[in-house]
C-alpha cells in the first residue's frame, strides 16, 4: 500500500479460463520459489494503481491451448492467482479482467487464445456453463483489428482508451444502455426501447470488423473500467453506402468525445475505400446534429418530416 503503481509480471505455463488458477513452470521453484512470486503479486494488487499481469504463450509445444478449462495433470504445480489478476497477455492480445464476471473473463480469454483452438475452447466453456448457452461464436473475431486501438485525452485531462468492440464487452455495453434517459434511447433507436436483453445485445455486438465496424471508448480508473461511448457504421444491403451512428454516456457529454469518435469512424471508412456514409437523425435531436456539423466532412442534408438525412461523401 505504501508503494504506488507497482507492476507484477508473472510468466506462467497455463491459465484456466477464469484466470483463477495457473500452472507454473516446472523448475520455477528455485531460490525464493514461486510461492513468493504469488505473494508479490498479491501485494501488488493492494498497491495504489498496481497491476498484476500474467503472461503466457497461447499454445504449448504440441499446439494445445495454454488457456484451459481445467487442469488434468501436474496438479502439484497448480496455484491460485489469489484473485489478483488484472491482465492476461498472449501473442494474440491483452485480456483486461479486473472487476469482470466469470462469463466476461471466459470470453476475454477466448479472444486472446490461438485462433486454431478458440472454437474448441468456446464450445467447452459453453458445456461447462461459463458462458451463455446461446452465445454465438464468430470465427471472424480472429480478425480483430488491433491497429485501430489508440488513446485520446479530452477536456479536463480525461484519458480514454479507444478500440474496436469485442463480444466480451456485452455487460459493459448493457450498463451503458441502462444509464441513458428514455429521451436519449428514443433519439438513438427511433423507438421507445426499455430493455436490452442478452440476445439483442449479443446480436448488436456481433460485428465482423468489415461491413460492420464498432468503436468503443473506455474510461479506466483504479476501481472500474467502463464504456462511455460507441460509434459504428454498417453497410446497407445494397452495399453502396454505410449507415453511421454514435452515442456518448450523458455524464461524459460536452467534452468533444462524440466529435472525435465520429471523425475516427470517418477516418477508418476512408482508409477502407468507403465512398459514402449516411446518418438519420430526428430533427429535435439538436446535440447529434451539432456534432455532425463539426466533423471533418461536411454533410449534405435532406429533410424528411421529423427526420434529417445526412450524407457524408468521402
Task: Give each language-model segment a name.
Residues 143-314:
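Long, contiguous binding/interaction regions
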Residues 1-136:
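Conserved phosphate- and dinucleotide-binding cores of soluble alpha/beta proteins
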Amino acid at each position: 500500500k505504501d508503494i504506488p503503481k507497482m507492476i507484477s509480471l508473472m510468466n506462467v505455463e497455463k491459465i484456466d479460463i477464469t484466470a483463477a488458477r495457473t500452472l507454473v513452470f516446472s523448475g520455477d521453484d528455485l531460490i525464493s520459489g514461486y510461492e513468493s512470486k504469488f505473494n508479490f503479486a498479491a501485494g501488488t494488487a493492494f498497491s495504489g494503481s498496481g497491476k498484476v499481469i500474467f503472461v503466457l504463450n497461447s499454445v504449448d509445444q504440441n499446439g494445445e491451448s495454454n488457456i484451459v478449462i481445467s487442469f488434468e495433470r501436474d496438479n502439484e504445480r497448480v496455484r491460485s492467482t489469489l484473485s489478483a489478476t488484472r491482465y492476461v497477455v498472449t501473442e494474440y492480445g491483452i485480456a483486461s479482467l479486473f472487476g469482470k464476471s466469470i462469463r466476461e473473463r471466459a470470453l476475454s480469454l477466448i479472444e486472446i487464445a490461438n485462433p486454431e483452438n478458440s472454437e474448441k475452447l468456446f464450445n467447452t466453456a459453453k458445456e461447462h456453463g461459463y458462458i451463455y448457452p446461446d452465445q454465438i461464436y464468430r470465427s471472424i473475431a480472429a480478425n480483430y483489428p488491433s491497429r485501430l486501438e489508440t488513446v485520446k485525452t479530452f477536456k479536463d485531462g480525461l484519458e480514454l482508451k479507444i478500440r474496436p468492440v469485442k463480444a466480451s464487452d456485452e455487460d459493459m455495453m448493457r450498463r451503458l444502455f441502462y444509464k441513458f434517459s428514455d429521451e436519449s434511447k428514443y433519439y438513438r433507436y427511433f423507438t421507445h426501447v426499455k430493455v436490452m436483453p442478452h440476445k439483442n445485445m449479443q446480436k448488436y455486438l456481433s460485428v465482423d470488423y468489415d461491413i460492420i465496424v464498432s468503436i468503443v471508448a473506455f474510461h479506466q480508473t483504479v476501481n472500474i473500467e467502463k464504456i462511455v461511448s460507441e460509434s459504428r457504421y454498417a453497410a446497407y444491403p445494397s452495399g453502396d453506402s454505410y449507415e453511421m451512428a454514435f452515442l456518448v454516456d450523458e455524464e461524459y457529454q460536452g467534452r468533444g468525445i462524440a466529435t472525435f469518435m465520429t471523425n475516427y469512424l470517418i477516418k477508418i471508412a476512408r482508409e477502407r475505400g468507403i465512398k459514402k456514409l449516411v446518418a438519420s437523425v430526428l430533427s429535435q435531436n439538436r446535440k447529434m446534429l451539432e456534432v455532425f456539423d463539426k466533423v471533418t466532412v461536411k454533410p449534405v442534408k435532406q429533410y424528411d418530416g421529423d427526420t434529417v438525412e445526412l450524407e457524408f461523401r468521402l
